[in-house]
Amino acid sequence: MEDEPLNIVLFSGTEDRLQAAAVMASGAAALGRKVNIFLQYWGLEAFRKDRITAGLGLAPEAGERGAALVAEAAKAGQQPWHATLRVAKELGELDIQACSLSMDVLKIKEEDLDPLVDGVEGVTAFYLNAGDGHILFI
C-alpha cells in the first residue's frame, strides 16, 4: 500500500473541505506516500491567485457551529488549508493538477492559478497517475 499513491479529486471549494483534503494529503506525504490532487470546478476556483487566501465559506452541513469550529481550530494553531498544502509539498511528493475541462468551462488560464498548482491535465491522465491507489472524492 505504501507504493500506491493517495489520489484526491477535490471538487468542493469550501474552507472545511479544503482543510480536510490538505490534512489527508499532508499526512500521507509525511508517511512517504505520493499524493495526487486533481482540482475540479469549485475546488479549482479556490486555487486562483486572487482567491487562495480569501475566506471561502463552509459546507452547508456545518451549520451555525461551523464558524465556531473554524475559530477554535485557528486558536489551537491549525494552519490554513493552503499553508498545510505548502508544508505537505516540503514533506513529500505532492502533485496538484488542475482539470483541463474545468479550466475551459470556468475560463481559467494557467497563469491565474497559485504556484501550488503544478500543471493542467485531463481526467485520463489523472487516472493513469492514480494507478491502483485509492481515490478520495472531496
Each predicted region: which residue ranges?
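A charged, amphipathic interaction segment
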Residues: 78-133, 138
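Histidine-anchored nucleotide/phosphate-binding helix
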Residues: 19-32, 37
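Short internal beta-strands
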Residues: 35-41, 97-99
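N-terminal beta-loop-helix "entrance" segment that forms/cooperates
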Residues: 44-56
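Short, hinge-like loop/turn segments at secondary-structure boundaries
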Residues: 53-57, 114-117
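Short, glycine-rich nucleotide/cofactor-binding loops
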Residues: 8-18
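A glycine-rich helix N-cap at a beta->alpha junction
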Residues: 55-86, 90
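Extreme N-terminal starter segment of soluble prokaryotic enzymes
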Residues: 3-7
